[in-house]
């Protein structure tokens, strides 16, 4: 059984998590932990959060029975949790709204964020515009090339987008730069981390804000079928959309849970982002978790067709869930994700994000091994508008 009280008071999920940061950040993290502990059960805070999720984000979003996709596959019934229908087009806004309300109560005037696919950057710039914060978003220069439309959206919303040209010029490097900024501007700045990684209390806090996904999906599936689903599937980069779906089901032992990492060009090629499958425990971005590193402990460059999964670490709770065996982690490669992207688009008229397409691809494989009476909930974590240029380029089309 999974203990619901994790993390412990030090932010540990078993041997993972914690607060591995420079002394200059410890006070800021303790201040944040104190504020979150104070407000997480505060009725005024929760009431305001609920109102914003309902009226601004558009929750609850539907649990959609993908009848045509299910029929074409010929196995289990596939249900899509439609996070792509949220305002800004992905699950990220669930968390940025929560952290923005916390920043407001803490008296901060400036918010910063890191972003890979650009969705978290857009969600942060969106809440900054709504609540009147100054906003700076750090983004790898490689990702800026891949996600030009999201970069423009952030700028339109009033954010300053800072290109990061160090390292692999992707998400891990953007996170490093954001942490450096926070060290220098701790007094007036709130760092809105977009995933369940980072130092305590971020993995817990982001999980709690994203758990609305699983809470809704659980109730919706019960309402539609009168029972719990047989399986859950979600993609895992840092892991926030996945833990958001998984967390409310962890104690339901009848429900199989699968996290899907980016297999890139194949695990055997070394060009992938599958930290849990091919990595080993180490410390990255303030927490102990599984990460992709060489024999000297240096973080490796990663690859995925989807910018949002292109990260060499993973949230510490996922590391714990892997070790305990409660969640099974799989890898889907670029070509399999692209096939699923096209199949869902053609059968259901829903264009998924490339990140979400990894989950859809594994759900298709899994469904074929199950009966028509069984069901799978897939977290459709975002929409594919941002990926049009990437997919078109792969197809040899210029848009």
UniProtKB/Swiss-Prot annotation:
InterPro entries (UniProt xref): Trp_synth_b_CS, Trp_synth_beta, Trp_synth_beta/beta-like, TrpB-like_PALP, TrpB-like_PALP_sf
Signal peptide, first to last residue: none
One protein family per Pfam: PALP
EC number: 4.2.1.20
Keyword list, A-Z: Amino-acid biosynthesis, Aromatic amino acid biosynthesis, Lyase, Pyridoxal phosphate, Tryptophan biosynthesis
Molecular functions per Gene Ontology: tryptophan synthase activity
Reactions catalysed according to its record: (1S,2R)-1-C-(indol-3-yl)glycerol 3-phosphate + L-serine = D-glyceraldehyde 3-phosphate + L-tryptophan + H2O
Membrane-crossing residue ranges in chain numbering: none
Keyword Protease: no
Modified residues (N6-(pyridoxal phosphate)lysine): 92
Any one annotated GO CC term: cytoplasm
Listed pathway(s): Amino-acid biosynthesis; L-tryptophan biosynthesis; L-tryptophan from chorismate: step 5/5
Requisite cofactors: pyridoxal 5'-phosphate
Family: Belongs to the TrpB family.
Task of the protein: The beta subunit is responsible for the synthesis of L-tryptophan from indole and L-serine.
Subunit text: Tetramer of two alpha and two beta chains.
Protein name per UniProt: Tryptophan synthase beta chain
Annotated organism of origin: Legionella pneumophila (strain Lens)
